[in-house]
Amino acid sequence: MKCFFPVLSCLAVLGVVSAQRQVTVQEGPLYRTEGSHITIWCNVSGYQGPSEQNFQWSIYLPSSPEREVQIVSTMDSSFPYAIYTQRVRGGKIFIERVQGNSTLLHITDLQARDAGEYECHTPSTDKQYFGSYSAKMNLVVIPDSLQTTAMPQTLHRVEQDPLELTCEVASETIQHSHLSVAWLRQKVGEKPVEVISLSRDFMLHSSSEYAQRQSLGEVRLDKLGRTTFRLTIFHLQPSDQGEFYCEAAEWIQDPDGSWYAMTRKRSEGAVVNVQPTDKEFTVRLETEKRLHTVGEPVEFRCILEAQNVPDRYFAVSWAFNSSLIATMGPNAVPVLNSEFAHREARGQLKVAKESDSVFVLKIYHLRQEDSGKYNCRVTEREKTVTGEFIDKESKRPKNIPIIVLPLKSSISVEVASNASVILEGEDLRFSCSVRTAGRPQGRFSVIWQLVDRQNRRSNIMWLDRDGTVQPGSSYWERSSFGGVQMEQVQPNSFSLGIFNSRKEDEGQYECHVTEWVRAVDGEWQIVGERRASTPISITALEMGFAVTAISRTPGVTYSDSFDLQCIIKPHYPAWVPVSVTWRFQPVGTVEFHDLVTFTRDGGVQWGDRSSSFRTRTAIEKAESSNNVRLSISRASDTEAGKYQCVAELWRKNYNNTWTRLAERTSNLLEIRVLQPVTKLQVSKSKRTLTLVENKPIQLNCSVKSQTSQNSHFAVLWYVHKPSDADGKLILKTTHNSAFEYGTYAEEEGLRARLQFERHVSGGLFSLTVQRAEVSDSGSYYCHVEEWLLSPNYAWYKLAEEVSGRTEVTVKQPDSRLRLSQAQGNLSVLETRQVQLECVVLNRTSITSQLMVEWFVWKPNHPERETVARLSRDATFHYGEQAAKNNLKGRLHLESPSPGVYRLFIQNVAVQDSGTYSCHVEEWLPSPSGMWYKRAEDTAGQTALTVMRPDASLQVDTVVPNATVSEKAAFQLDCSIVSRSSQDSRFAVAWYSLRTKAGGKRSSPGLEEQEEEREEEEEEDDDDDDDPTERTALLSVGPDAVFGPEGSPWEGRLRFQRLSPVLYRLTVLQASPQDTGNYSCHVEEWLPSPQKEWYRLTEEESAPIGIRVLDTSPTLQSIICSNDALFYFVFFYPFPIFGILIITILLVRFKSRNSSKNSDGKNGVPLLWIKEPHLNYSPTCLEPPVLSIHPGAID
């Protein structure tokens, strides 16, 4: 049991954590002895359902370990099997409930058959099975082998004598156990006192009475051998007198570590009498009073005062007027004389020993003849060795006389009430006290009566002498409901109670007492009568009933509280049933509705339309009165209006019905609920702020004071532009921290740049406009609205105020763009590459972007023209000048380092000449991400001159003249000695030079040409004074395209290019007309950078003289000189002759075939004739020869 409750607590905690049913039982096995009382605890945790759980115990016997034997249950009396039914019903086996979830199984008289496996089961109260519902443990029942023996004896010792007692303790238990031995002393009528003990762990211990003596060694406990234990008291004291015995217990350790006493045995006792050295004693006689009335009891007490009274022997005798009444020896058996023995037999007298030192004589019914002197005598006796007693000293006190008066009526009656004036409904309580001069002689009968104001008497209730109470006829019904009660409080005191009084209960209440005594014959007779009365005045409840409504706070502020008092007059006690209803008329309405009612029984009923009041309204009724206070907290507009209270006075009837006595309505109370006076103050300080764009604009709005610590603020931020009449809303933060962007923020795209912050202090609001733009300049201010939470949990705006303005100026960064202004002149040859450099020495921002443009001023063109442009996104564009001069393929841009831009013009041409410069624009990003031009600058100019190469064309002027014969060929060579460029090309033309005057020549076959030339010369005479006539023979352009041949030489010219610088013209079939001077004209052409050829220079050779010798004509020359004649003579006859031969052959073969009947059909090959070979001389000097070679005809 020592560890039961800690284990139980741990199991309860584990049950909560596991959240499943867990049944635990005391850990086994437990070893217990036969006949002992055993308890086994069991508890359950983690269950669902009622807190009080049921338990059922069963056992599985070793003889049948699988069979369950039911023992006892907390829920089913029929649960035990027959073998346990009798022991359960007899209370020897029962379950003790420690808590709702914990029990103890008790087996008071353990038997050997009780050994086995015990199971504790808890029926399920859970919604679903989850956990364990039973637990088991083993119980082993072993024989009780503990023996404790001591010699029974009676020892007489004198004070200060020594005492030795021995006790044998032995056990044969097989299990490991410990023994504890204790010596105890017991006196008659007292609890045993431990003298000394040896615990199971071999520790000596004594009670407080013997502890000091044990520490001094006067009390010892010694073990002699294995089983003997000796008690030694060296100096006995009178207090040591009593019975000494030894008690042994056998302990075993349970599995949980606790020790359990399996069995306890005590030996027989040794009675030790200690004779004190002092033998004196005194006697005194006592009684309560000495004057009595017949029938009253009297008691005399004879008190003996001596040392060690229980160990001494005294005899007592009682005497009346020196006559012996009774004697009592040491054995306490009274012996009475004949007269008093008769009275003792009828129960009228008693002689007894109340204690060792007190003796009593009691007479229950005194007689008149019992008046006299009474006394007692005490004699000490000594017991001899033979067991007889001898008288020694005797003593008696003084006599006590008593007087017994005869019986007579001496009663007096007094009536008292709880009040003389009461309120209707209060209880009336009357007490009727009967006083007697002596002891009451008999019995009393009592009648309670009411005398009303009309002197009508009615019986309320009466009590007869036998104690029977009966109500009067008019009070019978009220008495049946408990409205009228009468009671005998004491033998001489009677009470009347009238509950829930009514007005008609007013009047004079009288108590009439009659005293009765039993006569000698047993009949009752009246000894005397007495009566007493008291007046009662009852005030009606409705008298002066009125109700008034008051309030000390007719005007309140939001969230304040106000009280409404409904004062009931007169001041009724709390028990008076009064119902009070508060009615309410909201502002703007004409009807009242019930708000709340404090019912007559103390309950509270809310009206149908009082839901908004319930959580904020407290109704309280004074304990000492019926005044009802209505307290409304967190006042709002909803509670503003007119209030009125209605009181109803009720009376509860004796039959539990209710009667409404009166109803009163109070005056009207008007409650005004006002908003609190605002204390809002916003900082009005003005500020000027100038910053560069892309920096944040920090705007502050400070609330210097506020109405309440619970105030919330809505902050509206405005900006005022000079061009606008009113400010424009940027941002609004509502009182519940919601954001609303204004139209200005939407139009200007400020949403992504706005940042609102409320500081921890609560009264400082900040608006930050990130990445400020120039357009953000303006006058900024905030508009603060103070909002409070109404008692109805609705927010309302209390006040608003505008802050001072912050003048914000956002400017663009200062321009720091600067270009190199170095001037330059540059002269280059065509096809070379030109580098134009543009250097940015400084810029406004490292994040800026540059647009670089090159332009040129052409000679005789006042306007500049764009050559190329590098946009700020690094895109290269050609200008109009590039399109005109075919620069698109020749421009190249490089930027070797930041701020350095180089424009290369490849294959420059003469038309590229001009004055070049670069123009740079610096663009900065605006905070909104748009780029704008912040600065621009133009660099120094560079004059570019593109020159063509110098002409160095030379034609060989030293050419020898030549003479040729007619029909021969002559050559005209044109040799170029030097050229301007290796890439140049030449145009070559040969001319015939003749003198105009006298230079006319005729040649055969050339008369017509001569005439034509003469006509041309005549046409040119007027325009050209040159005496030399130039006639072109042949011209070859730089692109190797031949021009037309001159008419006289047409068909007789052959052109040859022997080398890149040597050209030859051969004139065939020279005639005398070809005689004359000839020259060659050379033009040098170079390619431009645009791949176009242009003429650089021209040169003409010296004239060459040619003389053709004239010869007479021959037939051959005539034929050869005439083409028609040549073909007629030498070519046409031969084909005709060949065709004639072929025709003859075909006719011949055809006739042969006809004679042979179609030879062709027999496969004879036809005659195939191939084209004859015609050989002729290309020089036309020999006639053509027609020959047929072998094989020509198959």
Curated annotation (Swiss-Prot):
GO biological process, one term: lacrimal gland development
Cytoplasmic topological domain: 1146-1194
SMART domains in UniProt: IG, IGc2, IGv
Glycosylation sites: 43, 418, 655, 842, 1077
Chain location of the short sequence motif EWI motif per the record: 250-252
GO annotation, cellular component aspect: cell surface; membrane
Entry annotated with the keyword tRNA-binding: no
InterPro entries per UniProt: Ig-like_dom, Ig-like_dom_sf, Ig-like_fold, Ig_sub, Ig_sub2, Ig_V-set, IgSF_V-set/TM_domain
Tissue expression: Expressed in a wide range of tissues with High expression in Placenta, kidney and lung.
Signal peptide start and end residues: 1-19
Chain positions covered by the region annotation Disordered: 997-1033
Extracellular-facing ranges: 20-1124
Disease / disorder: Lacrimal duct defect: A condition resulting in the imbalance between tear production and tear drainage. Infants typically manifest persistent epiphora and/or recurrent infections of the lacrimal pathway, such as conjunctivitis. LCDD is caused by failure of the nasolacrimal duct to open into the inferior meatus.
Protein name: Immunoglobulin superfamily member 3
